[in-house]
Amino acid sequence: MFTIYTYILVFVTKYRGKVFTKEVLDDVEKSFIEVCSKFESQLIEFNGESDHVHLLVSYPPKVSISALVNSLKGVSSRMIRKKKYQSIESKLWDDALWSPSYFASSCGGAPIDILRQYIEQQNTPS
């Protein structure tokens, strides 16, 4: 039997700085999709607000959640620094975008549609 883990992840910006715009979140989502594919994982749903993001990810047991999270946060942070967004550059703290912590919750038997609905209902900044 093939097992896939499904988790909700939440990452917050360092000091809860309100740095995300719709444009930035779109680029963050693209970087998350790329990272997930390298880990043989899938970004099922993504949404964010000005100071945090919600992800619904599935991944195989051979991948550790901490390795996936570290890569998601590291790659997206480097991408944002490289693009030098005016709205963010002055708000980065020692070049850190993300808080070092994260929230992760396994989804057990919860229906994916309900989890997607929860993430979709987050308020995306304009």
What is the predicted role of each segment?
Residues 1-126:
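Basic nucleic-acid-binding interfaces
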